[in-house]
């Protein structure tokens, strides 16, 4: 009975929280075109794959990604694939 009463009272709030949580957990691959552009930059700069802020802005404009996505892609790429020589 208490559970039903609480659900009735807070169901709107709970559904908003649930949808907000699901939005934030959305996860997926970057678009293929964007990955291609980033990989081209990566292959050209493999010895030191640390793009400047200007590079990141340019890559974001070319790919349509957020600067944070560009930054995260390079962090993950270096962690997974880069062997400093």
Swiss-Prot record:
InterPro entries: ELK_dom (IPR005539), HD (IPR001356), Homeobox_CS (IPR017970), Homeodomain-like_sf (IPR009057), KN_HD (IPR008422), TALE_homeobox (IPR050224)
Family listed: Belongs to the TALE/KNOX homeobox family.
Coiled-coil region: none
ELK domain boundaries: 1-21
Recorded GO MF terms: DNA binding; DNA-binding transcription factor activity, RNA polymerase II-specific
Keyword entries, A-Z: DNA-binding, Homeobox, Nucleus
Pfam families: ELK (PF03789), Homeobox_KN (PF05920)
Positions of the DNA-binding region: 22-85
Organism from which the protein derives: Zea mays
Major subcellular location class: nucleus
Subcellular location: Nucleus
A GO CC annotation given for this chain: nucleus
PROSITE patterns cross-referenced by the UniProt entry: ELK (PS51213), HOMEOBOX_1 (PS00027), HOMEOBOX_2 (PS50071)
UniProt function note: Probably binds to the DNA sequence 5'-TGAC-3'.
Protein name per its UniProtKB record: Homeobox protein liguleless 3
UniProt key word Nucleotide-binding: no
Alphabetized CDD domains for the sequence: homeodomain
């Amino acid at each position: 009975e208490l559970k039903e009463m609480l659900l009735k009272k807070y169901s709107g709030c709970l559904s908003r929280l649930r949808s907000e949580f699901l939005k934030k957990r959305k996860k997926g691959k970057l678009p293929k075109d964007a990955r291609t552009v980033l990989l081209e930059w990566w292959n050209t700069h493999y010895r030191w794959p640390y793009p400047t802020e200007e590079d990141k802005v340019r890559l974001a404009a070319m790919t349509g990604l957020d600067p944070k996505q560009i930054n995260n892609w390079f962090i993950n790429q270096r962690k997974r694939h880069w062997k400093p020589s």
